[in-house]
Amino acid sequence: MMRKILFSGALTLACAARAAVVTSGTLTVELDETAKGAVSRLVTAHGADLGPASAATSPLFSLRFTRTDDFTKSVWVQASDAASCVCERTPDGLALTYRGLGEACEQVVCTVKGGGEMVRWGVSVTAKPGWALEETTYPRMLLSKCLGTSPDDDCCVIGSAKGGVTRNPGAKGSKWWFRARQPGALVAQFATLYDDRVGFYLAAEDAAGHVKDLGASGATEGLEFSVRRFAFDANTSVQAFDVVTGGFEGTPEDPCSWHDAADLYKRWAVKQAWCAKRFQEREDVPAWMRDAPAMVRFTREWLQEPESVRAWMANYWRKEYPSVPLVMAYWGWEKIGNWVTPEYFPVVPDDETFAKLVKDMKALGGHAFPWPSGYHWTTTYDKQADGTFKWDDRARFAKVGEPHAVVNRDGKRYVRNPSWLRGGDCACMCGGDPWTVDWWNRDVCLPLTKLGCEMIQVDQVVGGAWPSCWAKHHPHGPGEGVWKTDGFRRQLQTMHAEMRAIEKDAVVCFEEPNEHFNHLVGIQDYRDCESRCEEWASVFNYLYHEYLPCFQSNPRRGNRMWQAHEASDGQIPFLSPAKSDGRGPSTPLLNGGFEQLRKGEIGFVGWEKLAGYKGVSWNGRMYVDHEVKHDGSTAIRLEVGKGERAVQVSQNVRLDDFIFQTGKRTFRLSAWLKTGRMACPNSVNFCFLGSQAPGGSLPFPKPEEGWKRVSADVHVPQGAQDLRIMMHVNGEAVVWVDGLRFAEVLADGSTKEVLISGKGAYDAFMRRWVELYHGEGRDWLAFGRQVKPPRIVCGTQPYEMTFYGGTHQACRKPVAFCNAYESADGRRAVVVVNATGIAQSVTLFDRGRRERLTLEPDEIRILKK
């Protein structure tokens, strides 16, 4: 009969009949003999029971085995399937040996060790001949749906790039799950469940980067936490790292938060290679990058008009921030279209013009930063009505790229259909094939470096991950394995070395963090504001702020919520430029007469033709019409033919100028509209981004009415960031738009053109942010270590989250954000940011002190302690 083995701090032993107990300094774990070692109880050092109220348990482990000669055939087993389970005492814990697990598994040995601060979990698995271990989920443990007396303060957080706080996870039901994988979205290898008084901590202490995921999922009787490792191991597989579990406690003055779990994780993380040097100490990063730069992004439209970039730099940036280095991200430089790969060259508008722009900007303190699309290879792009494609690279890919592309489990090539390819598709090159590493360096990075680019991001290789590759002819194991982390590490190292041979100040980057590569990159793409959780949790920046600067990848001009969070979180100030910046009074609506044409392609300056929405391709067409127009020399013509879905051309009109802040003025949107034919009603639609207020429309007239002036009067609602104008046509149709105008309605009913100063709330906020980040607050905001922030009590405001694919979710966000920092010399500061355009009262509870503050609209305040 199995003995109950109790390990206390002194590792004393006791015997009983039904269970085994392992105790660490923060957590006691009980394993149930009758359930073949399932975790039946978890108790913190202060006596808080974390387990479910019932006797329910989860099997201690579950495994997936796959045939070595047929990757499509797998079997799954779990601890409860074992014919036998023997528990033995070891010097520092327990060893549980399982046999009789079916056709694929010979034996499993689980170890559970105590005595230190954490309980440590290890496992080895022996596969039978002809089988390989593919997935190992261990340990699995069931926690209570309710910590304490109420679930209302229960929270779950994992170390995900787009993580966040899930409140009351026990109420989410059995279909809820919250997991992330590394390489991939898991930026730090821990998960936590906590309430105000107690917390549970689960982590993988893996310094090598084995492929794994971890997190929680709903179950009938509780919440299951586990770690799942992915590999393809025949014979015996030994987990090469410890999984650890522990507990932590809070007090009424200092309640538990996810920061406590992150602090536990950081004790281990700072001992790893990726934390060898703080960012300021790194000699491989150029001095200007260590001088707290700001950042800006220019799109394809700007690059087609290089003088507009020069004008912005000279008239705005150099006048406002003459001493601040500037990272200049370029989007849309690719030859064929945005994110179309790998036929990048010549770039937009041409190599010579682009290189001169890069050189000129560098002389003014600007550093070029293109983001080529990683390992993706576009095989087809922009599907036409007749089924052909605007760009078809299948023949070249078959000859050059396909032998090195990712292969699915069934032996077929991996194919993806992202929306930006407009009905086309792409392959993914395998980073575990050395050819891919060399191809990326030789054919993508070096040509860009020779054009003068100092910085390059490996975009779309999220967290250093790409799809599982089962190619038998590639020099890596099937499926997943630590070879994936090794391969991307080699990519970053060789990329930096080859770029640096041409450009001594080379900086490399990749999309979304992975802690294993912190020390190999000089700036980090970050997207925590895109979390689907109602409450953001910037786990990566909290852990590694002093080691690597982050920027919010997709900034939204005028989005006060994002700006306030990013500023309080110590992220790089990232500007969204407008052509009116630095020009003095100008019209907010650009090119409403459709007279300014884009260079090198069909289109109008200031207007964007959308490829689609929510995965639906909008494949109608836009034309520059020189014949049919109301006035001037051109009008825009929109057509939707038979078999086509829709066409939309749109523009966001900035509403962050002070003229729009009163809410009392009346404005009129009007346009000359004409219809050739129309199968169903359509209109020029408009809405207010950042506000729940309704929008409106300018309906297209009947064909027999000819040109007709159509208008709508509006009041700008509070909180509105942009007026989005959408010329949208569904069904078979031909329509024209000309003379679109945005004017103010005066008291006598007449109108006058709106002129903005270019000195609105957004400009003021960004100026203050840049000044603090680069100047007075740099010791904290740019280089400081984040520490557990004060608890902030403030109001909330409605907010609509918008996600990739166009889905929306309404929620409430705080009116202010707060974080705390410690400088390299030990000075502490608290940063509080107002996320609204009106004054707000907030209360901070900081180290036993209560402090009430009144924040001015959009204020960023540093409280030096």
Functional labels for PLM-detected ranges:
Residues 367-450, 530-544:
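Active-site-adjacent "subsite" loops/lids of carbohydrate-active enzymes
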Residues 131-135, 168-391, 573, 763, ...:
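Conserved structural scaffold segments of CAZyme catalytic domains across common CAZy folds
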Residues 233-242, 484-586, 753-829, 835-848:
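Active-site-proximal substrate-binding groove within the catalytic cores of carbohydrate-active enzymes
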Residues 428-523, 531-534:
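Active-site neighborhood of glycoside hydrolase catalytic domains
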Residues 21-27, 46-98, 102, 114-115, ...:
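Polysaccharide-binding surfaces and accessory modules of carbohydrate-active proteins
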Residues 851-865:
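C-terminal beta-strand-rich structural cap/linker in extracellular carbohydrate-active enzymes
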Residues 583-756, 760:
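Extracellular and organelle-lumenal recognition/adhesion modules and their flexible linkers in secreted
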Residues 290-307, 336-351, 420-441, 474-488:
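The substrate-binding groove and active-site-proximal loops of carbohydrate-active enzymes
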